[in-house]
UniProtKB/Swiss-Prot annotation:
Residues 1-69 are annotated as: Disordered. It is found in: Virion. Residues 17-30, 44-61 have a biased composition (Basic residues). Keywords: Capsid protein, T=3 icosahedral capsid protein, Virion. GO terms for molecular function: structural molecule activity. Residues 1-16 have a biased composition (Low complexity). Major capsid protein that self-assembles to form an icosahedral capsid with a T=3 symmetry, about 23 nm in diameter, and consisting of 180 capsid proteins monomers. Most of the 180 monomers are the major capsid protein, but a small percentage contain the minor capsid protein, which has a long C-terminal extension. Gene3D superfamilies: 2.60.120.20. Disulfide bonds: none annotated. The keyword ATP-binding does not apply. This is Major capsid protein. Belongs to the luteoviruses capsid protein family.
Length: 208
């Protein structure tokens, strides 16, 4: 009976040498292809905008709740050639209830920064006469003292007063008047004259 010697080169039941196993692992690793990421041209990356920590710093103007600025318009109608009267700007301005009984009562202080006085003529071409007007910046005069400034009854006109002319630079307590405009006509009582249209700009602060 002859004996056959089998060397370790057969796969069945016999382990391969370590050198061959290393070579096979290297071959498998070489077969793996790297993945390449392709970015489409012409598409720039988006950059995130950094927002400031305090957005309120961008706001300008008067903060809410501290002050306000309003414009009021009122009229004085049915004037005749010899009409006379006055506008006292402040809590005594009965011709403008929205200002006197409205917003003025909601603040401790105010100042009227401009006044536009307009006379709208409704007189006929045959009427004669004029309406004189005068500014009293400190409410010291109760009747017209000057006849220098006038509106012709048949033509009308307008006059603008800025803050420095009407005592409107400093703040006033809401319980006191700021200034006054007086007016008086020298025409006939039977002649229709027209109407006044008054526009005021008011600044207010320190709400109640």
């Amino acid at each position: 009976m002859s004996t056959v010697v089998v060397k370790g080169n057969v796969n069945g039941g016999v382990q391969q040498p370590r050198r061959r196993r290393r070579q096979s692992l290297r071959r498998r690793a070489n077969r793996v292809q790297p993945v390449v990421m392709v970015t489409a041209p012409g598409q720039p990356r988006r950059r995130r905008r950094r927002r400031g920590g305090n957005r309120r710093s961008r706001r300008t103007g008067v903060p809410r709740g501290r002050g306000s600025s309003e414009t009021f318009v009122f009229t004085k109608d049915n004037l005749v050639g010899n009409s006379q009267g006055s506008f006292t700007f402040g809590p005594s301005l009965s011709d403008c209830p929205a200002f006197k009984d409205g917003i003025l009562k909601a603040y401790h202080e105010y100042k009227i920064t401009s006044i536009l006085l307009q006379f709208v003529s409704e007189a006929s071409s045959t009427s004669s006469g004029s309406i004189a007007y005068e500014l009293d910046p400190h409410c010291k005069v109760s009747s017209l003292q000057s006849y220098v400034n006038k509106f012709q009854i048949t033509k009308g006109g307008a006059k603008t007063y800025q803050a420095r002319m009407i005592n409107g630079v400093e703040w006033h307590d809401s319980s006191e008047d700021q200034c006054r405009i007086l007016w008086k006509g020298n025409g006939k009582s039977s002649d229709p004259a027209g109407s006044f249209r008054v526009t005021i700009r008011v600044a207010l602060q320190n709400p109640k």
